[in-house]
């Protein structure tokens, strides 16, 4: 570490991270506010609610979380005071749960620590993702592979690494900034593995579908390699002793938390069997359940078997693949119920199982660039969920919202209506 009179300077790889004395003071003020909120009676009660929710099979109240990251550009800039780029990134990370807790009043917790995550990298087949931006929310992936038979030689070994030194430097920086105010904690979030997404990043979806039909052997070989590479990457972290178990308020994909009484929190070093895994396969929504069962699920099922618990799904419908595939996963504990899912079917299947009915409502209910809601539509949506998922363990994760009319009050009202609708 290099110290200066006015600045805290830490070198992170080839990047010099400089936090000015002014920005450091702002971050310390924010850290004090975070600790105040973390120890508030409401946050402490909410933490106990999540613990009870993690233990329950059903019957506990539905938990509701709003994922702010996709629309934070409409709300956070006016709250931010730091000037330096690095300081603003830290400030943004701290503000997210604070805004959820104080402005939205959903079930987001304010942590009594600043989390530092392991710096790691995984490049499937050694092919860096190439994207063409559209100038708006959309983008286009530029493919490497068009025909598996002709382009198979482009598939190299996957590249993966862990930057232990970079992680340590970030931890030291955070401790320097927050010394005496906010503890800094190394955190292992859930492990993620979505092979079909990786394939679509290097091979457009139509070509992937054609390969599934016309070149099954090469498609199987591609899935086999990717599964083996991911497992080697995860095993490397396990063998180096870099993992800690998570069964508490650590991040689980899809806007959820890791709360459960089936895993032990805080084991370090941990094994893969102590951890949550997240997987999805949105890209195969256009193939039949039988094709999914033959070409995709065997590799997913194998990966899932190495972990403690599993959360599955994003925007794809889960009901077509439930009976023949997902229901066979003994450690599945959360499944996404997207807007394209048959809610009643999945409610019937999940009732009494302890598998969380992780409802992802339509983004358009909240995500229109207007300051008000269609309140009747919001209520109807959540009443339908309450009816369909009666007897299930319900969790709401409102995601993929890109605009809210710049109104935190609108989001707060959405949470109020969701709670009212879920009451039946």
Show which residues each predicted segment covers:
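Active-site loop segments of alpha/beta catalytic cores
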Residues: 2-68, 83, 108-110, 159-424
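An N-terminal, globular interaction/scaffold subdomain
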Residues: 55-127
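A contiguous, low-structure linker/loop signature
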Residues: 121-148
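A gly/proline- and charged-residue-enriched helix-loop-helix capping module
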Residues: 139-168
